[in-house]
């Protein structure tokens, strides 16, 4: 949600205020959150800044909880990601995962992603941006990035998206099967 709000801010900086955000947020559809226009680095940087705003954070928290507890009709559940999902938004979630990868792997992945968008960016710029973001995310006062004790740590450094998905699915399936017995 923060990326789409950042997109709105960068597109209409003069209109950007809490009333504007409330109006825009009501119109967001799930498919909007996967739009490629939300992937550029400048959107991520702005999203990080916006997510420190307590009033916007309350709006987004409420929406995330709504999607988690009352997913759209055609869905029987939900999967949310974010720095504070496991301890603030959904502390009672059935399954919690904390995905990580080493810095160079994350930088390579992000660099490839940005290159696909035809962004003129250097690998070292991406690497430094991620270093800064990590520093900011772990040390921030409002909703820092942290792993909860009950979250399962998955290092994705050597995993493809598909292999990561399968690993998570297997953990969930095994747990559900165990609980049925």
Q: How would you label these PLM feature ranges?
A:
Residues 2-78, 84, 104, 108, ...:
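ATP-dependent small-molecule kinase phosphotransfer cores
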Residues 85-91:
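SF2 helicase motor core recognition
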Residues 14, 113, 117:
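Basic phosphate/pyrophosphate-binding loop/patch that engages nucleotide-derived ligands
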Residues 94, 147-162:
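Phosphate-binding beta-loop-alpha motif at adenosine-nucleotide cofactor sites
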